[in-house]
Amino acid sequence: MPSPISRTFAALLLAASPLALSACSESNAQESDRFAEVEIRAEPLADGVAVLFGAGGNIGLSYGPDGTVLIDDQFAPLTDKIQGAVKDLGAEPVKYLINTHWHGDHTGGNENLGQTGVLIMAQDHVRDRLIKGNDSTPPAPPAALPVVTYHDGIKLHLNGDEIRVQHMKHAHTDGDSIVFWQKANVVHMGDLFFNKVTLPFIDLSSGGNARGMLAAADKVLAMVDDDTRIIPGHGPMANKADLIAYRDMLKSVIGAVEKAQGEGKSLAQIQAMKPAAQWDVNPDAFIKGDAFVEAVYKSLQKPDHAEDHAH
């Protein structure tokens, strides 16, 4: 059964999703009105690589002579605005789409893009979860489903770069991928990295685990250098120093919770210790300290996927 945290997160996502709005019998006009004021802002990062900010997860973009690749697609009512931002960069319409994971603020535009012939790619579990849905998320329509899936990863040789897509197991969910432009030295981390806007959300009901979040941060840190541009799932652009600080936060909170669990302390007692207090500084954050500590606590009660994380 989904945890209260995951249900809350899903409810917030669905509050803005077209599927939920349809389920509530709201009109298409009302759906669009929710996003009428959203602007898609593009920031070039390297030759043929950009990030798009709007509502929902940050979007990565590769464009050039071999076609346009979108990394995540936010919400369905924003598809035309996203395509407009792509056009304004001088790029062709989207040809390929990679989903970093299955959540609706990263896959909400899948159906629109799929219906235009865009080739959708994602990790195996993303397709599985989109097909099944859950208590808060209806099953996705066929056009929204990835048609190319992978277990460990895939490489795209496009637009003068090698784009390496790698699965990070049991982290934010069980289907997270990072996308690394080798030549451009840009990496999109999806929701493996929330940069300065909230404490991390770990979707336990979708196979996520705090240990995997830490392992993913360590893996990416081993790949990057001081010049790497890092696209987080949410928040502003980041660099290696930002990711180090994020990794250290994860390590500190996980370590404190694990130590307290070993001493027999309950969840409430550990929350009262406020092990995430120094990072719980945004009053508007989606995930606050107690919710994050709860997710870490429950993660540590689950089997350790250390061997998976090492691969």
Which residue stretches match the model-derived regions?
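Metallo-beta-lactamase
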Residues: S27-Q30, P44, G67-T68, F75-P77, V126-K169, T173-D174, ...
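Conserved beta-strand hairpin/beta-sheet module of binuclear metal-dependent hydrolase folds
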Residues: I40-V86, V179-W181, V186-M189
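Bacterial Sec-type N-terminal signal peptides, specifically the leucine/valine-rich hydrophobic h-region
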Residues: P18-L21
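Bacterial N-terminal signal peptides that target proteins for export
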Residues: M1-L12
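Divalent metal-coordination and catalytic microenvironments
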Residues: G48, S62, D72, V86, ...
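Active-site metal-binding motif and surrounding structural segment of the metallo-beta-lactamase
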Residues: A42, P65-V69, P77-M121
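Accessory terminal helices/loops
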Residues: L12, A23-S32, A222-D227, P236-H311
